[in-house]
Amino acid sequence: MRISPPEREAKKVKIVIDKDPVSTSFDKWAVPGHFSRTLAKGPKTTTWIWNLHADVHDFDSYTSDLEDVSRKIFSAHFGHLAVVFIWLSGAYFHGARFSNYEAWLSNPTTIKPSAQVVWPIVGQEILNGDVGGGFQGIQITSGLFQMWRASGITTELQLYVTAIGALVMAALMLFAGWFHYHKAAPKLEWFQNAESMMNHHLAGLFGLGSLSWAGHQIHVSLPVNKLLDSGVSPQEIPLPHEFILNKDLIAQLYPSFGQGLTPFFTLNWNEYSDFLTFKGGLNPVTGGLWLSDRAHHHLAIAVLFIVAGHMYRTNWGIGHSMKEMLETHKGPFTGEGHKGLYEIFTNSWHAQLSLNLALFGSLSIIVAHHMYSMPPYPYLATDYATSLCLFTHHVWIGGFLIVGAGAHAAIFMVRDYDPAQNYNNLLDRVLRHRDAIISHLNWVCIFLGFHSFGLYIHNDTMRALGRPQDMFSDAAIQLQPVFAQWVQGVNSAAAGNTAPNALRNASYAFGGDIVSVGEKVAMMPISLGTADFLVHHIHAFTIHVTVLILLKGVLFARNSRLIPDKANLGFRFPCDGPGRGGTCQVSAWDHVFLGLFWMYNSLSVVLFHFSWKMQSDVWGNVTADGAVSHITGNNFAQSSITINGWLRDFLWAQASQVIQSYGSALSAYGLMFLGAHFIWAFSLMFLFSGRGYWQELIESIVWAHNKLKFAPSIQPRALSITQGRAVGVAHYLLGGIATTWSFFHARIISVG
């Protein structure tokens, strides 16, 4: 007798590994380019070293066996994790060995965090600035001190032990990477078992991960932070294991601990509301989110994800099947709906990676916005340098991941997409009306570009002609962001309605009180006006152009009217052969190349907007009578409404600290500012140049070498067009990002 129909049969979990599939051979790996027959022959021309770097991680080019590619990626993930653990270990070791963490912990409002002391070689010790408490070192802006305090670390010994633990984990990861490729490698069906993967990732990674973190926060972080907030010296606070072993210690701080698990099993959960809270707002002592709110949050997340990890059908015939869900997902106008998508995601890792990069990139930018509006860690909000750097960091990371999503979506289209498997499903229908999508996007970009920039040009012209009454500004013709103001109002009015007994709204950015710590503003209501409306439309413009470029690259990756057989030319190609004029720089790779520049444009405006807005309207000092004096004195609303204002009152005015940093502890940023400009300018040499020029130059240099009987055995070649563009964009972004980094650092460390 069958309980479920045959197609609902459970996926039985089997042993799905191969034993000893690949021998461990150092002799093979020692040969440069061992992964490619052509490269393994060694260099004939200088192009060899470029191809070596371009192809070393392109596992698709080694083999078309999906199982082998999957194993290589899986093994590489362990290698990546090992690098992450080594990097973390270094950060913790610096905290343990070279930092003023314990001094900062006892006085976080006046002492600045430092975890690097420069050795006195050729006068570099000038970089060791006075960070307070008699400590000389480089001020750090990673936010690690704040995170360590939040997790309950009170001594540098604890950091030291954690650093050693991270190295042990790194060794374990390296071993796992070798073991799961050479000794016990999973079969393809293991990688393709989407339901089991979802269950384990949701319940295990997110669910149990959050649960264990909630446990740590409740048993270690909460009591330690409560004592620190009360002014108890870090040396007098019991060690973490004492709180866990001695219930009376923690019951003095949180009385419900005295009752043990009785309220849990009698469903009287309200008893635990002394350490699982819904306060909302920020802790007035530290300017960070309430730790008891965060413990509550992680516990709730754990419950949700552990439940979610039981959603998908594996051994027992209950739960969702990914394939069924996707194929049932049809609308009235969407043809076959998502039929064929399951096969795409289980056979193309590029497609899966693309989706994950798009989601994680967006998430990183969302994180950036929450780090200042709802600062999660104690004393983070008043460390303006760290706030600015964390915002900048998460925004750049998000931008790169989103461009990566476009890149891998295009690689999927070129290498993995099978039109026969995708007839009349949503993906096919999007591809068939791609001209409408791209031309509409193009129109939107033109509209936004002319109108957003036009508003600024109007304002510059009116200000130049001495007609302030005719400008778009809060003092003349107002363009108030009414929808954004409505969202702010709804959120500030919602306190108490969004969560049971919540005392404050989620963020003071929406409205409410000024939270100050140590006479500095941690967070306060952010008022929006005409200036924000204008720059917001520049954001809309630059983001839409980035999307246009990336999406055009994906939708036209396989073919176009110009090159119907593009898929045969591959992901990157310079031109469609001789005699086909106008077919250069149209590969999917070239779209990623252009997308990177617009991503950089887009995010530069975002970072400049954030930096200036916060200095003008949020960050500053609070006097005894509650008056706030902001760093740049509210000049954003009137100065940022002209292009000239951005150049004069933001870029030029705020660059004074980095330009005048020579001879001070910030002088490294002055050198970086200069050097990064040079790297950026160097990129232009590759971007504004033709390959022929370089090849011709090389020929004459080779001629001179031959004359002197000094000719190299490896023939010099100019970079290919694609290589030149790659070198150009890499230096453009490195130069641009390092310029921004040094500009922000010198400015905000001086004034923040």
From Swiss-Prot:
Tell me the organism's taxonomic lineage: Eukaryota, Glaucocystophyceae, Cyanophoraceae, Cyanophora
Listed binding positions for phylloquinone are: 694
Give any GO molecular function from the UniProt entry.
electron transfer activity
Superkingdom of the source?
Eukaryota
Q: Mind telling me which Pfam families this protein's record contains? A: PsaA_PsaB
UniProt organism field? Cyanophora paradoxa
| Catalysis performed (reactions) | reduced [plastocyanin] + hnu + oxidized [2Fe-2S]-[ferredoxin] = oxidized [plastocyanin] + reduced [2Fe-2S]-[ferredoxin]
> EC number(s) in its UniProt entry?
1.97.1.12
List the PROSITE patterns. Answer: PHOTOSYSTEM_I_PSAAB
Q: Where in the cell is it found?
A: Plastid, Cyanelle thylakoid membrane
Q: Which UniProt keywords apply?
A: 4Fe-4S, Chlorophyll, Chromophore, Cyanelle, Electron transport, Iron, Iron-sulfur, Magnesium, Membrane, Metal-binding, Oxidoreductase, Photosynthesis, Photosystem I, Plastid, Thylakoid, Transmembrane, Transmembrane helix, Transport
Amino-acid positions noted as binding chlorophyll a' in the UniProt annotation, renumbered to this chain: 677
This protein's name: Photosystem I P700 chlorophyll a apoprotein A1
- Which residues are chlorophyll a-binding? 685, 693
Quote the gene name from the UniProt entry: psaA
Lipid biosynthesis listed as a keyword: no
The note on cofactor binding and number reads: P700 is a chlorophyll a/chlorophyll a' dimer, A0 is one or more chlorophyll a, A1 is one or both phylloquinones and FX is a shared 4Fe-4S iron-sulfur center.
Residue intervals passing through the bilayer: 73-96, 159-182, 198-222, 294-312, 349-372, 388-414, 436-458, 533-551, 591-612, 666-688, 726-746
